[in-house]
């Protein structure tokens, strides 16, 4: 039977993992066994947190919108309800941006929401 030489493949795989672990502390960046565990765990954290990031940012936007709408005399839930009744379709990301960078425009949106609530 022919001899199987696969050192090249193993070396390449090890190099790939160690390259991914570059910048890690101590054995995590030098020893393949430890580096493999560290890289795998880092991948799991990255996968989880890409999803968590969406939730975190939505929370931030809602907090900003709530603060700005309360300054204009309306709670967050009533503000969103009023916007829906007046069929203003601006998502929370943009609303939060408007709340932070353009208070005059946001105040106009709050007035629009108040009109929608009064009409209903």
From Swiss-Prot:
GO cellular component annotations of the record: ribonucleoprotein complex; ribosome
SUPFAM superfamilies membership: Ribosomal protein L20
GO molecular function annotations of the record: rRNA binding; structural constituent of ribosome
Keywords: Ribonucleoprotein, Ribosomal protein, RNA-binding, rRNA-binding
Biological processes per GO annotation: ribosomal large subunit assembly; translation
InterPro entries: Ribosomal_bL20 (IPR005813), RIBOSOMAL_L20_CS (IPR049946), Ribosomal_protein_bL20_C (IPR035566)
Organism superkingdom: Bacteria
One of the Pfam families matching this protein, by short name: Ribosomal_L20
Record HAMAP family: Ribosomal_bL20
Similarity annotation: Belongs to the bacterial ribosomal protein bL20 family.
Function: Binds directly to 23S ribosomal RNA and is necessary for the in vitro assembly process of the 50S ribosomal subunit. It is not involved in the protein synthesizing functions of that subunit.
Name of the protein: Large ribosomal subunit protein bL20
């Amino acid at each position: 039977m022919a001899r199987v030489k696969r050192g090249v493949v193993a070396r390449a795989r090890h190099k790939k993992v160690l390259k991914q672990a570059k910048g890690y502390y101590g054995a995590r960046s030098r020893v393949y066994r430890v580096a493999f565990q560290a890289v795998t765990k880092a991948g799991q954290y990255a996968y989880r947190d890409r999803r968590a990031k969406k939730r975190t940012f939505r929370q931030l936007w809602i907090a900003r919108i709530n603060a700005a709408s309360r300054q204009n005399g309306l709670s967050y839930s009533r503000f969103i309800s009023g916007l829906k009744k007046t069929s203003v379709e601006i998502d929370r990301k943009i609303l939060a941006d408007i709340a932070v960078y353009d208070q005059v425009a946001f105040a106009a949106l709050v007035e629009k929401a108040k009109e929608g609530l009064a009409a209903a």
